[in-house]
Amino acid sequence: MKPSYLLDSTVLIDHLRGIGEATRWLEKLREGEAVVSVITRAEVLCGETEEETISAYELCESFDCPPLTKDVATRAAELRRKNGWKLPDAFQAAMAMRSGLKLVTRNTRDFDPKRHPFVLIPYRI
């Protein structure tokens, strides 16, 4: 299955913290329907305890990680300059845009779906 979604760390971290809305949304995904960037993987793996890190690792292993490319890096730099985003957020946006994926996030401060049609806010807490 070709992926449709690029998952941001907010959704995965919410799931790991027991936020039911995140868990329910993730459970609806079919195998191969979503991917995570290496940036999301690194952010999620920053658990504070060994147990958190193990749970995070197991979760991250269930998603493919497409490579970052020069094209994505160039677009991320443009988006950072244009929008003032932090570089990890700019990379997420660039990867979603270049791959034709919906960026699934809860970060409405930076990613307003009205301004950015590549963004999907699956739930609010």
Locate each region found by the language model.
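Short, well-structured N-terminal submotif of metal-dependent ribonuclease cores
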Residues: M1-V36, L45-E58, I125
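Acidic, PIN/NYN-like endoribonuclease modules and their adjacent C-terminal/linker elements
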Residues: K2, A93-I125
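Generic structural signal for small/hydrophobic residues in well-ordered secondary structure
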Residues: D8-S9, V44, A76, A96, ...
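Alpha-helix capping/helix-boundary segments
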Residues: V11-L12, T40, V72, F91-Q92, ...
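Short active-site oxyanion
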Residues: G32-E33, E61-D64, M97-K102
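Acidic catalytic patch
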Residues: A42, E61-K82
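Short glycine/serine/threonine/alanine-rich loop segments
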Residues: R81, W85, L101
